């Protein structure tokens, strides 16, 4: 049994398979997920687990060189925006509709129980060397 890092077997498998510039999404429970993208649903009920909780655990286990978020998060969800800017990882913003279109390039979407608007981010994998 693993002692450290993400215990969810599907998330651990995806993280271990990422190469440089591969992308995964951490999403609220309302984001539409493209049919061809794996969905790892960790939601238990509204708000559990939260977007911020899942983001923190993934960032502790994944090398991330960039984030992509919806432009609307800045005004519509200041708490999530603070969490994103607090990572000190460069953020590129897109209009929400374009953000949704971009998720089709992800290897997986991790669906949280988050129920606040625009609580979604695309993480671009970096390298550890």
UniProtKB/Swiss-Prot annotation:
InterPro entries: D-ribose_pyranase, RbsD-like_sf, RbsD_FucU. It is found in: Cytoplasm. Pathway: Carbohydrate metabolism; D-ribose degradation; D-ribose 5-phosphate from beta-D-ribopyranose: step 1/2. It catalyses: beta-D-ribopyranose = beta-D-ribofuranose. Substrate binds at residues 28, 96, 118-120. SUPFAM superfamilies: RbsD-like (SSF102546). The keyword Protein transport does not apply. Homodecamer. HAMAP family: D_rib_pyranase (MF_01661). Catalyzes the interconversion of beta-pyran and beta-furan forms of D-ribose. Belongs to the RbsD / FucU family. RbsD subfamily. This is D-ribose pyranase. It comes from Halalkalibacterium halodurans (strain ATCC BAA-125 / DSM 18197 / FERM 7344 / JCM 9153 / C-125) (Bacillus halodurans).
